[in-house]
Amino acid sequence: MAQKVSDITATDIANYIRLDEVSEDDTKTLNDLIAISKAFIENYTGHTEKELDDYPDFAIVVYILCQDMWDNGTLYVDNSNLNKVVETILGMHSVNLL
């Protein structure tokens, strides 16, 4: 499991969500999920993409968000049903608390 957000790959996510065989389409989708997760973290916390690596627990958030989107077959994060672990971690590091 990658310790920095920038180190997370589609293979890491595939292993985390226990995909046995990963097609080219799956890899593309997983890369999209990683990008969506990073953007969500940036928007939620107010941190830049470069700053995400300063917080190792953001890597956990990426894994959880990707798994949630994969399981639900969506390409967006559902704010109304946000995982409590994700919400707690992001809340601890938010700089845009308006």
Regions found by a protein language model. Name each.
Residues M1-L98:
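Divalent metal-cofactor coordination and adjacent catalytic microenvironments
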